[in-house]
């Protein structure tokens, strides 16, 4: 939500949601559609584009993200790593961008993100590889990479982000936070 508001300050935004078959996606996708229909976004957000990039053929069927059994509340970020997630998402969305003459992809990793596919070196390398492979310039920006979550929340407050329409949960109950996973813990902190 904050990323969309931030990017929309000076350009139209084409939001993209990529389904991978993960347990939380149905609730997340429904709330994303509601969020993007909120008055704050209406003047600069294009309709949500849905893409598919299933991972059930590469992650084991017992993987917590597929089954909806996330690690517990006290789990550190490093325990919820989804191998290759950003590589897959960026590859998929970059093809969409090339076909639609979009050059900018915004991602929202925060300071302290421990994952190898969320580093400046990774984003720079994959942007170069995708630009070469697609014969289309791809610029991957990460405007919050030096910010902590609380800084992003404060920024979102200045934009008037409707937090009640956001979801940060790995095992939502209908459209509500489960209150038991590490993403719910982060949200409360």
Which stretches of residues belong to each language-model region?
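Local cysteine-cluster metal-coordination motifs and their immediate loop/turn environment
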Residues: 87, 91, 165-188
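ATP-dependent adenylation/nucleotidyltransferase module used to activate substrates
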Residues: 1-160
